Amino acid sequence: MRNSEKQDNLVRAFKALLKEESFGSQGEIVDALKQQGFESINQSKVSRMLTKFGAVRTRNAKMEMVYCLPAELGVPTVSSSLRELVLDIDHNAALVVIHTGPGAAQLIARLLDSLGKSEGILGVVAGDDTIFITPTMPVSTEQLFKSVCELFEYTG
């Protein structure tokens, strides 16, 4: 096996362990990786990996201090602004289309739906990361596009 393959396997195993287990010390992580066949792993390597992947120590449900990885990029968090979740807004003659981070479309669609006809929105359909918005009759798609861009402070 090539070095890059070994490194990829180590990274996958490391991330999986931190997601699935509760490790209170770097030594526990070293032991778990050695049990998976990574014999050359040591505490300093684990320390560098924890730093590289942004791992932090936090309290779990049992109030124990454990290492965990931050949420994956693009996944909404409590502190995420809705504006940060909107990646692109575009339109054609019939629809306004919003592209979001993975899993964020339904949250944003719910907000848009709540604005309703008073804001020129006839209906909203959301998938995982794409939203289709249809304007009401008196509102043009261009007007709705501009309103949605203002709402999310999108300048794209």
Swiss-Prot record:
Assigned GO CC terms: cytoplasm
Keyword Lipid metabolism listed: no
The species this protein was found in: Vibrio campbellii (strain ATCC BAA-1116)
Places the protein is found: Cytoplasm
Keyword check for Repressor: yes
Listed transmembrane segments: none
SUPFAM superfamilies on file: C-terminal domain of arginine repressor, Winged helix' DNA-binding domain
BP GO annotations: L-arginine biosynthetic process; protein complex oligomerization; regulation of arginine biosynthetic process
Family: Belongs to the ArgR family.
Descriptive protein name: Arginine repressor
Recorded GO MF terms: arginine binding; DNA binding; DNA-binding transcription factor activity
Keyword vocabulary terms for this entry: Amino-acid biosynthesis, Arginine biosynthesis, Cytoplasm, DNA-binding, Repressor, Transcription, Transcription regulation
Domain of life: Bacteria
Job of this protein: Regulates arginine biosynthesis genes.
